[in-house]
């Protein structure tokens, strides 16, 4: 690559295929929420990969799925808009699961919505299976996509093949100047990142019914009046039902304290200063199906 290249890449795939982990590994810092719960990414977060010869802007999308709620429909619409606006689509398929109807459906969606966009298939999580399983998956992917498919196996966890993937993606971008200054790693507002970090901490280790029902809104961020090394962050966690409120708070508030501690440490890393984090839990009944409430909660 002689001339500088820059452009937009989005990782797509069914929920839980390692897209957010891959984004964070390539950027080198945490810009996308990771959780072993499907459907945990809700905003298209742009992570930025800087090199001397290129700049890749990674757009992280929610996993495509057949929607059951208005929120699900809005997330899918967001994904489809993203498909048609990027330079390269990276379809993520995990090495440790057989290709299924979900992968086929997503491939069809990509080709229907963005038939001309360059497609690279990324076989993720190769550290989780033996080499022969990886080889078998590469063959299966080739059968799904076609013999001309560009396929790159990677592990975001160990870093294996990430440099190869970066070069492949960069090689497919158009020549052009950098979109963002060197050193900038995301264009997400700090408040959005803070809300996502709190949401990630709250989702850790909880039962399946909660992830889709949890939204976090940053209510207020202000420097502490008598101390210049402390920032007060007030946030509200919204759930849909009383029973979910109990799950988030835990017995005697123990669970909410754990969430607060985990999130505070991540937010302190993000802001580079000490943080006092105040969390409150409120009920917003059936917010996923209510257009007014979706708007109020930032969707």
Swiss-Prot record:
<keyword id="KW-0134">Cell wall</keyword>
<feature type="binding site">
    <location>
        <begin position="60"/>
        <end position="64"/>
    </location>
    <ligand>
        <name>GTP</name>
    </ligand>
</feature>
<feature type="domain" description="Era-type G">
    <location>
        <begin position="5"/>
        <end position="175"/>
    </location>
</feature>
<dbReference type="InterPro" id="IPR005225">
    <property type="entry name" value="Small_GTP-bd"/>
</dbReference>
<dbReference type="GO" id="GO:0005576">
    <property type="term" value="C:extracellular region"/>
</dbReference>
<comment type="subunit">
    <text>Monomer.</text>
</comment>
<dbReference type="GO" id="GO:0030313">
    <property type="term" value="C:cell envelope"/>
</dbReference>
<dbReference type="InterPro" id="IPR015946">
    <property type="entry name" value="KH_dom-like_a/b"/>
</dbReference>
<dbReference type="InterPro" id="IPR027417">
    <property type="entry name" value="P-loop_NTPase"/>
</dbReference>
<keyword id="KW-0964">Secreted</keyword>
<keyword id="KW-0342">GTP-binding</keyword>
<dbReference type="Pfam" id="PF01926">
    <property type="entry name" value="MMR_HSR1"/>
</dbReference>
<dbReference type="GO" id="GO:0005829">
    <property type="term" value="C:cytosol"/>
</dbReference>
<comment type="function">
    <text>Exhibits GTPase activity. Binds RNA but is probably not involved in ribosome assembly in mycobacteria.</text>
</comment>
<dbReference type="InterPro" id="IPR009019">
    <property type="entry name" value="KH_sf_prok-type"/>
</dbReference>
<dbReference type="InterPro" id="IPR005662">
    <property type="entry name" value="GTPase_Era-like"/>
</dbReference>
<keyword id="KW-0694">RNA-binding</keyword>
<dbReference type="GO" id="GO:0019843">
    <property type="term" value="F:rRNA binding"/>
</dbReference>
<dbReference type="InterPro" id="IPR004044">
    <property type="entry name" value="KH_dom_type_2"/>
</dbReference>
<feature type="binding site">
    <location>
        <begin position="124"/>
        <end position="127"/>
    </location>
    <ligand>
        <name>GTP</name>
    </ligand>
</feature>
<dbReference type="GO" id="GO:0005525">
    <property type="term" value="F:GTP binding"/>
</dbReference>
<feature type="region of interest" description="G2">
    <location>
        <begin position="39"/>
        <end position="43"/>
    </location>
</feature>
<feature type="region of interest" description="G4">
    <location>
        <begin position="124"/>
        <end position="127"/>
    </location>
</feature>
<dbReference type="InterPro" id="IPR006073">
    <property type="entry name" value="GTP-bd"/>
</dbReference>
<dbReference type="GO" id="GO:0043024">
    <property type="term" value="F:ribosomal small subunit binding"/>
</dbReference>
<comment type="similarity">
    <text>Belongs to the TRAFAC class TrmE-Era-EngA-EngB-Septin-like GTPase superfamily. Era GTPase family.</text>
</comment>
<feature type="region of interest" description="G5">
    <location>
        <begin position="154"/>
        <end position="156"/>
    </location>
</feature>
<feature type="region of interest" description="G1">
    <location>
        <begin position="13"/>
        <end position="20"/>
    </location>
</feature>
<keyword id="KW-0547">Nucleotide-binding</keyword>
<dbReference type="GO" id="GO:0003924">
    <property type="term" value="F:GTPase activity"/>
</dbReference>
<protein>
    <recommendedName>
        <fullName>GTPase Era</fullName>
    </recommendedName>
</protein>
<dbReference type="Pfam" id="PF07650">
    <property type="entry name" value="KH_2"/>
</dbReference>
<feature type="region of interest" description="G3">
    <location>
        <begin position="60"/>
        <end position="63"/>
    </location>
</feature>
<dbReference type="GO" id="GO:0000028">
    <property type="term" value="P:ribosomal small subunit assembly"/>
</dbReference>
<feature type="binding site">
    <location>
        <begin position="13"/>
        <end position="20"/>
    </location>
    <ligand>
        <name>GTP</name>
    </ligand>
</feature>
<feature type="domain" description="KH type-2">
    <location>
        <begin position="206"/>
        <end position="285"/>
    </location>
</feature>
<dbReference type="InterPro" id="IPR030388">
    <property type="entry name" value="G_ERA_dom"/>
</dbReference>
């Amino acid at each position: 690559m002689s001339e500088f290249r820059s452009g937009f890449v989005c990782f797509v795939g069914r929920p839980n295929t390692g897209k957010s982990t891959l984004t964070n590994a390539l950027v080198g810092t945490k810009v996308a929420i990771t959780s072993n719960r499907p459907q945990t990414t809700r905003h298209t977060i742009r992570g930025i990969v800087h090199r001397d010869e290129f700049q890749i802007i990674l757009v992280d999308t929610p996993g495509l799925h057949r929607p059951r709620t208005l929120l699900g429909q809005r997330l899918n619409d967001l994904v489809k808009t993203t498909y048609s606006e990027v330079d390269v689509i990276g379809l993520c398929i995990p090495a440790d699961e057989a290709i299924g109807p979900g992968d086929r459906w997503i491939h069809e969606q990509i080709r229907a919505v963005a038939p001309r966009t360059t497609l690279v298939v990324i076989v993720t999580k190769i550290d989780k299976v033996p080499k022969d399983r990886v080889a078998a998956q590469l063959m299966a992917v080739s059968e799904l996509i076609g013999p001309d498919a560009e396929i790159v196996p990677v592990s975001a966890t160990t870093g294996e093949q990430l440099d190869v993937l970066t070069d492949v993606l960069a090689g497919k971008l158009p020549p052009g100047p950098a979109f963002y200054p060197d050193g900038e790693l995301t264009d997400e507002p700090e408040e959005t990142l803070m809300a996502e970090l709190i949401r990630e901490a709250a989702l850790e280790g909880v039962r399946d019914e909660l992830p889709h029902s949890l939204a976090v809104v940053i209510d207020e961020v202000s420097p502490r009046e008598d101390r210049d090394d402390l920032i007060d962050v007030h946030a509200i966690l919204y759930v849909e039902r009383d029973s979910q409120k109990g799950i988030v708070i835990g017995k005697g508030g123990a669970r909410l304290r754990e969430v607060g501690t985990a999130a505070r440490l991540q937010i302190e890393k993000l802001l580079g200063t000490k943080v006092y984090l105040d969390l409150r839990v409120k009920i917003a009944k059936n917010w996923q199906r209510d257009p007014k409430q979706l708007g109020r909660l930032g969707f």
